[in-house]
Amino acid sequence: MNIKIIGVGKLKEKYFRDGIAEYLKRMDKFAKVKIVEVADEKAPENLSEAEMADVKAKEGDRILGKIKDKEWVIALAIEGKQRPSEVFAKEIADLGTYGHSDITFVIGGSLGLSPAVMKRANDTLSFGKLTMPHQLMRLVLMEQIYRAFMINIGSPYHK
């Protein structure tokens, strides 16, 4: 299985990079995991609705440029589908079983994802209504993907 995580902006904080590196190492035996960063658009405070849409559209174009036709795309969004870890694990396993071996997760920037990215997504995922920095969301997503693999092999990691 190939897993790609596309995120807007660079991870500058060492503690986030270290955490992600740890999960990349742990997942190495289950999947080839690749992190792809796309440039974020500079967004000053107090943007109009039109300016926000423009920022999301520009970031969205960069994201879409990193997605291949065959990839199964899961967009992370507050309004996405919430599910327990066990259900998420089964969905990941089922995707592989049904021939979707290239899974791409997309994490938007501070303003979220463009309508074009949401339209391209085959599914959505939400970790709840909480607002989190998109940098932290990368680490949380990595942990949940790792947890899914652990659930699927019956590991005691998930208790």
Swiss-Prot record:
It is an enzyme of class 2 (transferase). Keywords: Cytoplasm, Methyltransferase, rRNA processing, S-adenosyl-L-methionine, Transferase. It catalyses: pseudouridine(1915) in 23S rRNA + S-adenosyl-L-methionine = N(3)-methylpseudouridine(1915) in 23S rRNA + S-adenosyl-L-homocysteine + H(+). S-adenosyl-L-methionine binds at residues 76, 108, 127-132. One of its GO terms (cellular component) is cytoplasm. Belongs to the RNA methyltransferase RlmH family. This is Ribosomal RNA large subunit methyltransferase H. The gene is rlmH.
